[in-house]
Each structure stands twice: as structure tokens, then as C-alpha cells.
């Protein structure tokens, strides 16, 4: 019996004349170009079922290192189950806290029904008291501030953070925090406060250049927002010395962005390319419901292939780290499947899906009371966290990335378990990642 075999998680992509290998277990770190001589050796090994491998050769060691070859006794499906269980039962408490349903923006594609609703004092106390009562159950705590526009309620962020930081410090548990914001209120004063609250990861959206952004992401009265956001980011770059923070600038792409990709990249590379704390991320504008997106449905991209192909031809210092991480193990898995992840609504309602809060037909899984008691419907929780093995996914190379499931909300609400992976798009991303990461050649 041969000692090694090809991994079931392998993918071979051809970018012109170049052969690229990818493995969804080793992720971006395992991407390699394969030289013609290495291809020939691999072909020869395949012909005799890997009986003639030269175990001392550099080529063999490289294939082994990137995960393309694995020991024959390795049960990779069993290994996948192990990683799924490990992910689902993470000992970290992750709370996504909606500080408000309100927003100062009216983006053309937003699915949310904005309401003048802010997080109640009972909900704030509930978060604090829940963590105080249960901190012994968790190895660490992470709070993601969400909305609406979360920075419209800085007082709530300060109040909760101060108490939770103290609780975690006394219990010797690490505490981390992030915020998803439109960037308009990311002012010098608020930045100072957020850093004191241990917010270190900032996720904000700027839709390309000034021209495209100010068409898609405007204030309630229709006023532009681009210049104000860039001003805030330049303050972080020039006046915030700490290196212990990361700013991810997301751009939601439509067909209108295709012709401006070069100027888009040059603009951000020029401003932030020399500061490693800043990175870019591109995602397609998607139809998550609501009436606004219907007005631009003809501008929605069928997939991101053309965007990835164009960006792969550009060179600069600023990187697309988050897009590269889309190829990492478990990166396509929705956090709602995790046992210890909860989304807290303004009224203390407990959800699994971040997009479910305050929407018509929402299905909370429980409620968080001011004394820290979290009453959960365990039947509802089970629907979100249930690990369902889909036969059609069992042998898929990408199953270490998605853990064999699409959107849990679709499964829970519609009783459908549909694969939403576009494999042509994945191949384009692999080819782009090989260039972006400047990977080695075997």
C-alpha cells in the first residue's frame, strides 16, 4: 500500500499557462504555483498510485507541506468532523450587540428597516450581568458592536465596555472588541473613546471612489459622505500611534465599479499603502431583501470573477487581507452556527443571525433580562447549531471552508440547505491570491 495519497481537499486551478494548487485545509498558506518539472513528477506518481515517490525529494516535501499529499491512513472526513466540532464549540463568548436600529445613512442597497430605537438600559445591564455570572464558562470574551450605526450610541458602548473590561480583568480572561461602522462618526473624539474601550478592529464600508460612493452611501437628506470618512481615516493614520489596531475598508461592488477599479486601488494605495494597519476588502452588493435594492438590481454582479481578475493585475502595498482569508478553513461558515455566539437586540431579544434583529418575521431564540438571565428556546437553538451532513457535500474539496452548509438562516426559515458557493468565483480568488500573496513555486 502506498504511504501517501492526494488530499480530498485539493483544487487545481490554471491561470493561463500556470498551474496553481490549493487545499481548503491549509488555506492561503498552502497555495503554490507548480513548475512543469514538478507537474511531471506528480503525473508519474499518479500513474503508479504514488508507489514510486522519492521521499527525499524537495518536490515531495513541498507537496506534503502545502497539504496536497497526506498519509494514506489519514481519514480526512473524520478530520473534517473534528474541525467542525472544534469550531462549533469554541470556548470564546462572542456577542454581537445592536446599540441602535437607527442609522444616519440611507444606502441604496440596504435591507434594514431603520427605526429610532436604541439599546435599552435593561439590555445593557443584561449583557454586563450575563458576563459577570458566566465568565467562568468561557476562555475569552469578544463583543462586536453593530447596528444600524453603532457609533450613534457611544454612551452605551462606553458603559458596557467599562464594566465588561473590569469583569474580564478580575477573572483573568482576555477581552477583545470590534465595530462595524459606516465611518462617518469615526471622529477623533470617538476614536479615543473606542480605543479606551479596547475596540481594536474597525470594519467600515467605502464604496470605491468618491463618485461611486456618494451615489450609493448618502446621509438621510441625500448629502455626500465620502470626504468626511476619508478625513476620519487620515486622522487614524497620522495621529493615532498605536499599532495594535486594524482598519478594514470594505467596498460593496456593482457593475458600476468595473471601469474604476484601477483608480479605486490607486487612491487607497496612495493614502494608506504605507500603513500596514489598513487593508481593503471587496464584496458584491447582494439582495438581502427590502425595497431599496430593487432600484439597482440591474447593476448587481453575477459573481466576482471579473473584479478578482482585474484586481490581480494591480500592484501596490495595500493588501486585501480579508479576501485572502476567505480561503481559510471555516471562513465561509456563518458564526450563527457557533454555540457560544449570540446577537443581542436593542430590547434584549437574543438572536443567532445578525440580519434578523428587528426585521419583519424575525425569530428570536430567547431573551436576555437585566439581571443577566438568558432564557433560550433550546429547540430553536438546535435548529441553528445542528450539524447536518449533506451527501452532495461529502466529497467536495471546499468542504473544509464551508463545513458543508450554506446560509443557516435559509435553512431555518425555508427548510432549505442550498450550496451558495460559486466555484468559478473561488477559482478566480485562488488565482488572485497566488499573485497577491506572491506564493512560492514547487
Question: Across the structure, where does each feature detected by a protein language model lie?
Answer:
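Local cysteine-cluster metal-coordination motifs and their immediate loop/turn environment
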Residues: 102-112, 352-355, 390-409
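Iron-sulfur (Fe-S) cluster-binding segments and ferredoxin-like electron-carrier domains
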Residues: 110-122, 360, 400-431
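Short Fe-S-cluster ligation motifs
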Residues: 130-149, 419-442
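Radical SAM enzyme [4Fe-4S]-AdoMet core and its adjacent flexible, acidic
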Residues: 211-230, 234-337, 346-347, 363
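C-terminal accessory region of radical SAM enzymes
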Residues: 298-328, 355-403
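Short, acidic, Ser/Thr-enriched surface-loop or helix-capping motifs
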Residues: 24, 344-345
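N-terminal [4Fe-4S]-dependent radical SAM core
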Residues: 6-33, 56-96
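Conserved alpha-helical substructure of the radical SAM core
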Residues: 78-192, 197-200
Amino acid at each position: 500500500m502506498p504511504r501517501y495519497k492526494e488530499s480530498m481537499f485539493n483544487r487545481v486551478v490554471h491561470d493561463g499557462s500556470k498551474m496553481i494548487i490549493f487545499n481548503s485545509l491549509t488555506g492561503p498558506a498552502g497555495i503554490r504555483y507548480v513548475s512543469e518539472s514538478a507537474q511531471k513528477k506528480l503525473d508519474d506518481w499518479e500513474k503508479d498510485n504514488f508507489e514510486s515517490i522519492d521521499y527525499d525529494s524537495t518536490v515531495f516535501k513541498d507537496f506534503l507541506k502545502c497539504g496536497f499529499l497526506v498519509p494514506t491512513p489519514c481519514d480526512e472526513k473524520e478530520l473534517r468532523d473534528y474541525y467542525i466540532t472544534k469550531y462549533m464549540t469554541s470556548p470564546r463568548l462572542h456577542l454581537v450587540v445592536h446599540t441602535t436600529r437607527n442609522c444616519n445613512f440611507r444606502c441604496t442597497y440596504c435591507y434594514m428597516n431603520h427605526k429610532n430605537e436604541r439599546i435599552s438600559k435593561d439590555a445593557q445591564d443584561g449583557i454586563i450581568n450575563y458576563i459577570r455570572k458566566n465568565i467562568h464558562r468561557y476562555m475569552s470574551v469578544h463583543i462586536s458592536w453593530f447596528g444600524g450605526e453603532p457609533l450613534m450610541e457611544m454612551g452605551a458602548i462606553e458603559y458596557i465596555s467599562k464594566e465588561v473590561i473590569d469583569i474580564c480583568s478580575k477573572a483573568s480572561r482576555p477581552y477583545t472588541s470590534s465595530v462595524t461602522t459606516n465611518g462617518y462618526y469615526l471622529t477623533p473624539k470617538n476614536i479615543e473613546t473606542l480605543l479606551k474601550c479596547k475596540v481594536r478592529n474597525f470594519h467600515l464600508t467605502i464604496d470605491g471612489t468618491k463618485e461611486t460612493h456618494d451615489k450609493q452611501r448618502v446621509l438621510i437628506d441625500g448629502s455626500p459622505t465620502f470626504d468626511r470618512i476619508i478625513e476620519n481615516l487620515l486622522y487614524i493614520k497620522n495621529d493615532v500611534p498605536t499599532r495594535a489596531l486594524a482598519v478594514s475598508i470594505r467596498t460593496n461592488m456593482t457593475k458600476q465599479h468595473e471601469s474604476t477599479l484601477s483608480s479605486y486601488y490607486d487612491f487607497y494605495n496612495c493614502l494608506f499603502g504605507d500603513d500596514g494597519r489598513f487593508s481593503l476588502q471587496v464584496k458584491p452588493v447582494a439582495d438581502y431583501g427590502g425595497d431599496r435594492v430593487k432600484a439597482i438590481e440591474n447593476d448587481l454582479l453575477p459573481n466576482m470573477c471579473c473584479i478578482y481578475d482585474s484586481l490581480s493585475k494591480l500592484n501596490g502595498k495595500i493588501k486585501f487581507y480579508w479576501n485572502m482569508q476567505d480561503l481559510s478553513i471555516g471562513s465561509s461558515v456563518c458564526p450563527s452556527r457557533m454555540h457560544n455566539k449570540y446577537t443581542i437586540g436593542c430590547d434584549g431579544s437574543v438572536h443567532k443571525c445578525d440580519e434578523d434583529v428587528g426585521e419583519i418575521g424575525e425569530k428570536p431564540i430567547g431573551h436576555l433580562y437585566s439581571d443577566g438571565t438568558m432564557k433560550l428556546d433550546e429547540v430553536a437553538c438546535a435548529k441553528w447549531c445542528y450539524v447536518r451532513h449533506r451527501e452532495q457535500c461529502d466529497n467536495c474539496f471546499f468542504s473544509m471552508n464551508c463545513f458543508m452548509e450554506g446560509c443557516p438562516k435559509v435553512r431555518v426559515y425555508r427548510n432549505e440547505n442550498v450550496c451558495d458557493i460559486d466555484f468559478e468565483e473561488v477559482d478566480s480568488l485562488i488565482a488572485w491570491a497566488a499573485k497577491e500573496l506572491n506564493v512560492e513555486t514547487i
